A protein has these predicted regions:
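Short, exposed beta-strand/loop patches in secreted or surface proteins that constitute
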Residues: 26, 48-52, 65-66, 110-116
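Envelope-exposed proteins and targeting segments
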Residues: 31-33, 46, 55, 62-64, ...
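An acidic-aromatic
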Residues: 47-96, 162
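Gly/Pro-enriched, hydrophobic low-complexity segments
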Residues: 109-111, 116-187, 194-196
Length: 197
């Protein structure tokens, strides 16, 4: 949060674009990625692992599992003991998976480079269409060594914030398609499935 309060803009949006385009290239070059995450803020606190490949992902945490195969999303919650099925919009995906900000950057956001440090660049993203975006802004810290995000702070339209720290990247994976599709063996027997499509 201090970053948002004290960081000064240090370059034009085009420079922010260049930094973020490097992040997009690094994400694509990494192919399959697994990364540990820790999240705090408006939607509660959680930690776990995100596995990503192209536009697919699987998020595993202590209280939920979420699968997305590029079209359909299955979300299991330990609190409700049910699996919900939906076909999310691009805007909805950004709330579930922070890396969706990267894949939607060129069409959805304008980038400005902020004051970083010796090891990281910091880029502020503002939505091109504020009415349809879930966020009013997203600040992404990108490691210079890997060009991959290490922290994401998203400000919702109601001014609440979500902070996500990313660490322990494993790249170059080749995950089977089944990784990103709901499998009942990962949830308790008798779990209710609710189809919201």
């Amino acid at each position: 949060l201090a970053i948002l309060a004290i960081a000064s803009l240090s370059a034009a949006a085009g420079t922010g674009d260049a930094v973020f385009n490097k992040a997009i290239a690094a994400y694509k070059a990494a192919k399959g990625i697994a990364v540990k995450y820790s999240m705090t803020g408006a939607v509660g606190n959680s930690s776990g692992e995100i596995i990503m490949q192209g536009n697919k992902f699987c998020i595993t945490a202590s209280n939920m599992i979420c699968w997305y195969n590029g079209k359909t999303q299955w979300s299991y919650s330990t609190m409700s003991n049910e699996v919900s099925i939906m076909e999310p919009t691009a805007s909805e995906l950004q709330v579930v998976n922070p890396f969706s900000v990267i894949s939607n950057f060129q069409t959805a956001y304008t980038a400005t480079l902020m004051k970083g440090n010796a090891s990281s660049n910091i880029v502020q993203l503002r939505p091109k269409n504020a009415r349809t975006s879930q966020f009013s802004q997203v600040v992404v810290t990108i490691a210079k060594k890997t060009n991959l995000p290490s922290k994401i702070i998203a400000t919702m339209r109601d001014k609440s914030k979500i902070s996500i720290t990313l660490s322990g990247y494993r790249t170059g994976g080749n995950f089977p398609a089944s990784t990103f599709v709901y499998n009942k063996k990962y949830v308790p027997a008798g779990t209710q499935v609710v189809d919201l499509r």
